[in-house]
C-alpha cells in the first residue's frame, strides 16, 4: 500500500512542474519571451501627433534591489529626458514635420525615448502606485511551495515505508523462532515430560496467591498434591484458556535451567475459608456433612496430578502446596488447617469494609502503622459480629428456617385454599390472643374480652360449608399435621355454632356505639329544624331577597311572588351588576348590614361631618358582624346537611335484625344442655337482650319524631312543594351551601367598607378650611340661639 502511494507522488511531480511552467508563461511573460514581441503597456493604441506638449512625468523611483533573489538585477537609472525648445512662427511647418517624423520613428522604439507623452502612460503613472514586491511574491507563490513540499513528503513517506518494512521483517523472524502452541502442549503432555502444575488465586486484597510452576516429574522438591478439603476450594473468577496456560508453561520450561538447579517458589498462603453456615436447631442440622469431592484425575501415565481444567470443563479449584512447603509466615507448631477451618466456620461472615491496602514503605522510614502494631487497644468482636453480620448469612439462616418450615409444611395436610390459608395466618399473627383464650371467650359469651376488631377478624375467617365439613371430619390424632390456619379453625369449629356466637358477640360489642350514633344524629336533626325555623336573621335575608326579586321581576310571570324555594339563594351570586363585580347577594347583604347596624346604634344629630362618617362606618361594621354570625347560629343545620337518611334508616334496621340473631343464638344455646359454659353464655346474652330491646324501641321512636320534624320544616319553607323533594334532608344541604357563599360575601363587603371609610377620611382632611367651617357653622348657631 505504501509503495502505491509513493508511485502516485512520483507521478504527480511532473504534472506539478508542467502546471508551474504554464502559470509562469501566463503571469510572467517577460521571463519567457524576448522583448519587442508585444506592445508595452505605456505605448498608445494610436499615435498622438497633434497633442499639446505636456510636462514629462517625474521619473519613477528606483526599484529595490534584492541580491538574494534569483532574478534580481542592479537598478538602472533612466535616461535623461530633454524638452525641445519652442520654435518660431516661421518655422512652424518645419517643426511639425520634424515632430511627425520623430513620432513615426519613436513608434517602433521604447516609450521612454518618445518626446510626446501618451495618455495611457500618464494615466497609469498618476492613478496606479508602483509596487516593487513582484519578485518576492513570485518566489513565495503557492506553486513553488508545492514544488518544495512534494519532495519533502515523498522523502518522509519513503522513510516511514522503510521503517514499516523493517518492523514486519523483524516480527516474522521472531515468530518463526517460537514453537507453536500445539507442539508445546504435546511436549508437556507426553509421558516422558509429565508436569505438575500448581494454581491458586490471590488478589490484591490478600485472599490468596497465584503460582504456576512447570518442571519435570523427576524434580525431588515437587511432588503431586492430593485434593484439598471442600472448604479450601475456591472458584476462580477469571481463568485463562488452556492453550495459553500450557503455552506459557512450555515457554518457561524451555527458558528454565536444568531441574537440579531449580528451586521451587515459596507456596502461597492458604486462602480464607468460606463463610460458615449458621447453627441449626432443627432436624436438618443432625444430617451428616456432605462428602468431600473426589480426587482429581491423574495424567496419562499416572505419574502426576493435572489441574482440573485440563481434564474437564468445570470450575477450577485452588490446590495448596504440600505439607513440606510451609509458608514462611506460618509455623509448624500452629494449628492444623482442619482446626482453623472449624474455628473460622464458627464465626459468621461480616459486611466488608472497602478500602485500599497500603504496602510498607520501601524507604524503611517508620510510619504510623508501625506504632499501632504495639497498641494494646482491642475491639469487641462479639459486638461487631452482632451489628455487622452479612446479609448473606442472615438470608442463609432464614433460608434454613424456611427450608425446615417447608419440610414441615410438605407433611401438613392442606384443607383450605392456599391464598385463604395465608391470609388467615397473617390475621392470626396480628391477634393479641391465643387460641385457648379465643375459644374460652366464645364459650362464655364474653364479647368485651375479645373486642370489636378481633371479632371482625374472626368473622372474616369463616370457612365455607365444604371446608367446615373437611375440618370436622379430620381425625384428632392427625391435628399436628395441620397448618396454623387449619388447626385454629378446627379448634374454633369444635365450639357449637361458633360463628353464630361470633356474630352475636360482634353485635353486642357494637351495640352501644351504634345506639349512641343514632341518638346523636336524630337529636341533631331536631335541633337543626328548630334553628332554621326560629332564626330571625335568616328570615330577614329571605325577606330582603323576596322584595329585591319582585322588583327585578316586575312585568314578568315571575313577579309578585309571595314565596320562593330556598334553591334561589344559591343563584344570587350569578346575577351581577353593571360594574361586573357587585352581585345581587352583595346588594342584599349591604342593605341588611345597614339595617342591623342602625337598629343597634342609637341615632342622633351629628355634631360635624367627621363624626357622621365615623358613625356610618361603625354602623356598617356592627351590622356586618351580626350578618356574619349567621353561620354560627345555624351550626346544627350544617351537621344535618352531612347526614344521609338512608344510612340512618339502615342502621336502625340492622339493630332490629341483630336482636333476632341474638334470640336465635340464645335458643341454640338452650338446646345444648346446662353445663357451666352454656349457663354463662345464657346469662350474659339474656341480660343484654332485655336491655337491647328497650334501647331499640327508644331509637325507633326518636327516628320517627326527627323525620316528622324534618318534613314539617321543609313544608314551612317550601309549602306544598315538599312532596316534590327527592331527599328528605335536602333543605339542610341548600342552607349549608348558602352559608358558605354568605361567608365569602361578608368578607368582600367588609373590605369594601374599609376602603370607603379610608377614602372618605382622606377627602375630609384635604378639604379647604372654609368648607369645613361652613359645615360646622349651622350647629354652632343653633347652640347660640338655644343658650340665649
From Swiss-Prot:
Cellular localization per UniProt: Membrane
FH2 domain ranges (all copies): 340-768
Disulfide bonds: none
Region of interest (Disordered), residue spans: 48-118, 193-307, 322-347
Stretches that traverse the bilayer: 148-168
UniProt superkingdom: Eukaryota
Membrane topology recorded in Swiss-Prot or TrEMBL: Single-pass membrane protein
BP GO terms, sorted: actin cytoskeleton organization; actin nucleation
Pfam families named in the record: FH2 (PF02181)
Amino acid composition bias (Low complexity), ranges on this chain: 97-118, 209-219
Record bears the keyword Manganese: no
GO cellular component, one term: cytoskeleton
Keywords recorded for this protein, A-Z: Membrane, Signal, Transmembrane, Transmembrane helix
MF terms in GO: actin filament binding
Start-end of Basic and acidic residues biased regions: 327-342
First-listed, main subcellular location of the protein, grouped into a coarse class: membrane
Family: Belongs to the formin-like family. Class-I subfamily.
PANTHER family (UniProt xref): FORMIN-LIKE PROTEIN 15, FORMIN-RELATED
Protein name: Formin-like protein 15
Organism encoding this protein: Oryza sativa subsp. japonica (Rice)
Organism lineage string: Eukaryota, Viridiplantae, Streptophyta, Embryophyta, Tracheophyta
Name of the gene this protein is made from: FH15
Amino acid at each position: 500500500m505504501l509503495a502505491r502511494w509513493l508511485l502516485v507522488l512520483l507521478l504527480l511531480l511532473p504534472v506539478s512542474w508542467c502546471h508551474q511552467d504554464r502559470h509562469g508563461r501566463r503571469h510572467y511573460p517577460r521571463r519567457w519571451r524576448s522583448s519587442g514581441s508585444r506592445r508595452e503597456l505605456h505605448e498608445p493604441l494610436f499615435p498622438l501627433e497633434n497633442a499639446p506638449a505636456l510636462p514629462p512625468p517625474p521619473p519613477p523611483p528606483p526599484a529595490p534591489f534584492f541580491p538574494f533573489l534569483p532574478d534580481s538585477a542592479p537598478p538602472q537609472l533612466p535616461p535623461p529626458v530633454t524638452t525641445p525648445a519652442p520654435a518660431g512662427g516661421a518655422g512652424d511647418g518645419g517643426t511639425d514635420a520634424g515632430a511627425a517624423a520623430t513620432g513615426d520613428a519613436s513608434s517602433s522604439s521604447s516609450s521612454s525615448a518618445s518626446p510626446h507623452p501618451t495618455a495611457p502612460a500618464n494615466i497609469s503613472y498618476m492613478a496606479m502606485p508602483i509596487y516593487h514586491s513582484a519578485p518576492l511574491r513570485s518566489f513565495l507563490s503557492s506553486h513553488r511551495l508545492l514544488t518544495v513540499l512534494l519532495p519533502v513528503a515523498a522523502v518522509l513517506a519513503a522513510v516511514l515505508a522503510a521503517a514499516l518494512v523493517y518492523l514486519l521483517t523483524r516480527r516474522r523472524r521472531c515468530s518463526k523462532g517460537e514453537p507453536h502452541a500445539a507442539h508445546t502442549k504435546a511436549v508437556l503432555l507426553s509421558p516422558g515430560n509429565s508436569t505438575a502444575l500448581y494454581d491458586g488465586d490471590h488478589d490484591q486484597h490478600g485472599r490468596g496467591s497465584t503460582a504456576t510452576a512447570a518442571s519435570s516429574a523427576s524434580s525431588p522438591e515437587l511432588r503431586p498434591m492430593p485434593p484439598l478439603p471442600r472448604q479450601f476450594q475456591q472458584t476462580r473468577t477469571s481463568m485463562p484458556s488452556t492453550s495459553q496456560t500450557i503455552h506459557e508453561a512450555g515457554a518457561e520450561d524451555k527458558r528454565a535451567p536444568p531441574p537440579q538447579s531449580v528451586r521451587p517458589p515459596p507456596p502461597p498462603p492458604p486462602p480464607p475459608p468460606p463463610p460458615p453456615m449458621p447453627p441449626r436447631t432443627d432436624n436438618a442440622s443432625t444430617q451428616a456433612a456432605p462428602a468431600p469431592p473426589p480426587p482429581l484425575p491423574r495424567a496419562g501415565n499416572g505419574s502426576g496430578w493435572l489441574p482440573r481444567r485440563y481434564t474437564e470443563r468445570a470450575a477450577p479449584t485452588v490446590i495448596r502446596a504440600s505439607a513440606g512447603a510451609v509458608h514462611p509466615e506460618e509455623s509448624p507448631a500452629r494449628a492444623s488447617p482442619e482446626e482453623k477451618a472449624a474455628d473460622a466456620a464458627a464465626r459468621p461472615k461480616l459486611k466488608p469494609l472497602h478500602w485500599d491496602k497500603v504496602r510498607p514503605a520501601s524507604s524503611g522510614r517508620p510510619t504510623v502503622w508501625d506504632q499501632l502494631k504495639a497498641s494494646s487497644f482491642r475491639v469487641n468482636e462479639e459486638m461487631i459480629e452482632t451489628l455487622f453480620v452479612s446479609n448473606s448469612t442472615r438470608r442463609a439462616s432464614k433460608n434454613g428456617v424456611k427450608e425446615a418450615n417447608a419440610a414441615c409444611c410438605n407433611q401438613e395436610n392442606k384443607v383450605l385454599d392456599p391464598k385463604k390459608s395465608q391470609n388467615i395466618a397473617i390475621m392470626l399473627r396480628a391477634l393479641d390472643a391465643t387460641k385457648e383464650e379465643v375459644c374460652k371467650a366464645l364459650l362464655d359469651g364474653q364479647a368485651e374480652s375479645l373486642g370489636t376488631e378481633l371479632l371482625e377478624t374472626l368473622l372474616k375467617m369463616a370457612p365455607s360449608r365444604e371446608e367446615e365439613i373437611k375440618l370436622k371430619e379430620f381425625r384428632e390424632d392427625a391435628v399436628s399435621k395441620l397448618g396454623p390456619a387449619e388447626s385454629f379453625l378446627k379448634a374454633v369449629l369444635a365450639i357449637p355454632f361458633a360463628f353464630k356466637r361470633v356474630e352475636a358477640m360482634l353485635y353486642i360489642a357494637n351495640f352501644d356505639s351504634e345506639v349512641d350514633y343514632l341518638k346523636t344524629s336524630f337529636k341533631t336533626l331536631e335541633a337543626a329544624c328548630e334553628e332554621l325555623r326560629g332564626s330571625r336573621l335568616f328570615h330577614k335575608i329571605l325577606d330582603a331577597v323576596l322584595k329585591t326579586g319582585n322588583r327585578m321581576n316586575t312585568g314578568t310571570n315571575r313577579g309578585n311572588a309571595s314565596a320562593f324555594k330556598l334553591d334561589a339563594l344559591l343563584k344570587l351570586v350569578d346575577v351581577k351588576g353593571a360594574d361586573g363585580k357587585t352581585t345581587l347577594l352583595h346588594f342584599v347583604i349591604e342593605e341588611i348590614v345597614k339595617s342591623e347596624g342602625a337598629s343597634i346604634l342609637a341615632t342622633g344629630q351629628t355634631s360635624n361631618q367627621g363624626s357622621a362618617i365615623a358613625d356610618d362606618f361603625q354602623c356598617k361594621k356592627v351590622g356586618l358582624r351580626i350578618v356574619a354570625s349567621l353561620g354560627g347560629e345555624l351550626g346544627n343545620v350544617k351537621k344535618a346537611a352531612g347526614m344521609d337518611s338512608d344510612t340512618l334508616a339502615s342502621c336502625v334496621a340492622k339493630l332490629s335484625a341483630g336482636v333476632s340473631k341474638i334470640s336465635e343464638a340464645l335458643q341454640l344455646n338452650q338446646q345444648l344442655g346446662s353445663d357451666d359454659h352454656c349457663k354463662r353464655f345464657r346469662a350474659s346474652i339474656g341480660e343484654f337482650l332485655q336491655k337491647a330491646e328497650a334501647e331499640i324501641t327508644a331509637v325507633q321512636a326518636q327516628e320517627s319524631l326527627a323525620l316528622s320534624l324534618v318534613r314539617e320544616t321543609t313544608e314551612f319553607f317550601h309549602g306544598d312543594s315538599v312532596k316534590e323533594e327527592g331527599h328528605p334532608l335536602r333543605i339542610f344541604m341548600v342552607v349549608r351551601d348558602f352559608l358558605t357563599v354568605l361567608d365569602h360575601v361578608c368578607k368582600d363587603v367588609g373590605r369594601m367598607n374599609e376602603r370607603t371609610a379610608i377614602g372618605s377620611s382622606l377627602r375630609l382632611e384635604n378639604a379647604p378650611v372654609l368648607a369645613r367651617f361652613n359645615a360646622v357653622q349651622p350647629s354652632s348657631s343653633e347652640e347660640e340661639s338655644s343658650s340665649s
